[in-house]
Curated annotation (Swiss-Prot):
Protein name as annotated: Guanylate kinase
UniProt-listed SUPFAM superfamilies: P-loop containing nucleoside triphosphate hydrolases (SSF52540)
Domain of life: Bacteria
Keyword entries, A-Z: ATP-binding, Cytoplasm, Kinase, Nucleotide-binding, Transferase
Gene Ontology MF term list: ATP binding; guanylate kinase activity
InterPro entries linked: GK/Ca_channel_bsu, Guanylate_kin-like_dom, Guanylate_kinase, Guanylate_kinase_CS, P-loop_NTPase
EC number: 2.7.4.8
Keyword Disulfide bond: no
Broad EC category: transferase
Predominant localisation class: cytoplasm
GO annotation, cellular component aspect: cytosol
Binding site for ATP: G12, P13, S14, G15, V16, G17, K18, G19
Length: 209
């Protein structure tokens, strides 16, 4: 049975450990996902490879893709565009490969409007106190910035109902395993495979044998 890949949208508050969990998933040889390559208008840095680290495009090229509806989601940050090219995602999914998109909540909501049958997974901390401890432990943000991130986390957690699944990141290996189990189960949802079986039972050649 030929099956199109799944678009997996993975997000959660800043500091919850999205990148760490994603790295844990991709560190295992048994995963069958491809990490989504983002597009940006920022300058290519030494050692970066176009098409691997990012798709590097000019501002004019990026804005033309926006006008033509060819960006799955995008945002402007510090004067540069960042986003997910729709053509790349569709080409990968058409090969039967799942695409793993780690993204902020607002970007995920953009994706949901365009690809409602994607799998939306929200990663949460055990509680906000632990999230604050993780942010403090980074040692990169001031108290003011941490307070802003906690407030934003409250707002993002309030949008959890827009997602299909929530995974608690209490331990990274366990959280990664839960994510993989969710994706595996999604491949067996009736609505994803029923078309194949409808075609199978309507094939009159079977009754002629």
């Amino acid at each position: 049975m030929s099956e199109r890949g799944l678009l997996i949208v993975f997000s959660g508050p800043s500091g919850v450990g999205k990148g760490t969990v994603r790295q844990e998933i991709f560190s295992k040889s048994d995963h069958k996902f491809e990490y989504s390559v983002s597009m940006t208008t920022r300058a290519q840095r030494p050692g970066e490879v176009d098409g691997k680290d990012y798709f590097f495009r000019s501002r004019e090229e990026f804005e033309e893709l926006i006008r033509n509806g060819q960006m799955l989601e995008y945002a402007e940050y510090v004067g540069n565009y960042y986003g997910t090219p729709l053509a790349y995602v569709n080409e990968t999914l058409d090969k039967g490969i799942d695409v793993f998109l780690e993204i902020e909540v607002q970007g995920a909501l953009q994706v949901k409007k365009k690809v409602p049958d994607a799998v939306f997974i929200f990663l949460t901390p055990p509680d906000l106190n632990e999230l604050e401890e993780r942010l403090v432990g980074r040692g990169t943000d001031s108290e003011e910035v941490i307070a802003q991130r906690i407030e934003r986390a409250r707002e993002e957690i309030a949008l959890m109902s827009e997602y299909d699944y929530t995974i608690v990141n209490d331990e990274v290996p366990l959280a990664a395993e839960r994510v993989k189990r969710v994706i595996e189960a999604e491949h067996f949802r009736v609505e994803r495979v029923i078309g194949h079986y409808r075609n199978m039972i309507s094939d009159k050649r079977l009754s002629d044998k």
